[in-house]
C-alpha cells in the first residue's frame, strides 16, 4: 500500500501551505519525506538551485537538504541537559560551523522573537510545554531555513498553552518565512495559511484558499471530513 501516491506540490517563497486531512492521510509522512527522515523510494525536491533525486540521494545531499529544511515536531525534542540558549545554538555551531559569539547572538535574537529572552538560561525541565515548543521553533528558525516544516506543532500541548506557540508561528509567517504546516486546528489554519491542501490516502484531493477549502469544499471526501470535524470539535 502506498502511503504517498505521486504527491507533488510547489511552494512560493514566503508562502504558508497547510496540509489537512484525516489521520493516516499521509500528511506527516510527506513532511518527514521532504527532509529524508522518511526515505521515499522515488521522487525529487528542488529548492532554488539545489535539486536532489531521492532514489540516488547521497549523504552530502542529505546534509544540504536538512540545512535548507528545518522541522518542528509534535514533541519538543530538546536536549535535557542544555539550556534554552544552548539548545538553539547547537545547530548553528555543529551544522553551520559558526563561532560561539555568532551563534550566541543569533540564538538570543531568535529566543527574543518567541518571547523567551528571560528563559534563555533555563533547562527544559524548568520550562512549560509551550515554552519548550517555542524553544524548538526558535532553534529551527535560527538555522534560517528555506522552508520551515511544522508537524502538528501544538497537538501535544495543553489547551491553555496552544495560543503562545501559534502566535510565534504566526509572527514568523508574517515576517516572510516559507512554511508547510500540518495541523488539525482549522481556526489556526485559516489564520496563518495562504493555501490549504486536503490529503486523502496519500493524494491531494483538493487545493484552495482556507475559506474555499474549510467553508466551501467541492470534493465529496473533503465535505465528509469537515462534517466529521464539526461533530468532533464544535
Where are these regions (language model features)?
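ABC ATPase NBD coupling module
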Residues: 52-70, 174, 216-217
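Conserved ABC ATPase signature
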Residues: 123-127, 131
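A short, proline-enriched helix->beta-strand linker immediately N-terminal to the Walker B motif
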Residues: 142-146
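Catalytic Walker B motif of ABC-type/P-loop ATPase nucleotide-binding domains
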Residues: 148-151
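Helix N-cap at the start of a conserved alpha-helix in ABC-type nucleotide-binding domains
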Residues: 159-161
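A short, surface-exposed alpha-helical micro-motif characterized by mixed small hydrophobic
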Residues: 189-191
Amino acid at each position: 500500500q502506498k502511503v504517498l501516491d505521486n504527491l507533488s506540490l510547489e511552494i512560493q517563497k514566503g508562502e504558508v501551505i497547510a496540509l489537512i486531512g484525516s489521520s493516516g492521510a499521509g500528511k506527516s509522512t510527506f513532511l518527514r519525506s521532504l527532509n529524508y527522515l522518511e526515505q521515499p523510494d522515488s521522487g525529487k525536491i528542488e529548492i532554488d538551485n539545489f535539486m536532489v533525486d531521492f532514489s540516488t540521494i547521497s549523504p552530502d545531499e542529505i546534509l544540504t537538504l536538512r540545512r535548507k529544511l528545518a522541522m518542528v515536531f509534535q514533541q519538543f525534542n530538546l536536549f535535557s541537559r542544555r539550556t534554552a540558549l544552548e539548545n538553539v545554538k547547537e545547530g548553528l555551531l555543529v551544522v553551520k560551523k559558526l563561532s560561539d559569539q555568532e551563534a550566541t547572538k543569533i540564538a538570543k535574537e531568535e529566543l527574543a522573537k518567541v518571547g523567551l529572552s528571560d528563559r534563555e538560561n533555563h533547562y527544559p525541565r524548568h520550562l512549560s510545554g509551550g515554552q519548550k515548543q517555542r524553544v524548538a521553533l526558535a532553534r529551527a528558525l535560527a538555522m534560517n531555513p528555506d522552508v520551515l516544516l511544522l508537524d502538528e506543532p501544538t497537538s501535544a500541548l495543553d489547551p491553555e498553552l496552544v495560543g503562545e506557540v501559534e502566535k510565534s508561528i504566526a509572527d514568523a509567517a508574517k515576517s516572510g518565512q516559507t512554511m508547510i504546516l500540518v495541523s488539525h486546528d482549522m481556526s489556526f489554519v485559516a489564520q496563518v495559511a495562504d493555501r490549504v491542501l486536503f490529503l486523502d490516502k496519500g493524494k491531494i484531493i483538493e487545493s484552495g484558499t482556507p475559506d474555499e477549502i474549510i467553508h466551501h469544499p467541492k470534493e465529496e471526501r473533503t465535505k465528509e471530513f469537515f462534517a466529521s470535524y464539526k461533530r468532533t470539535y464544535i
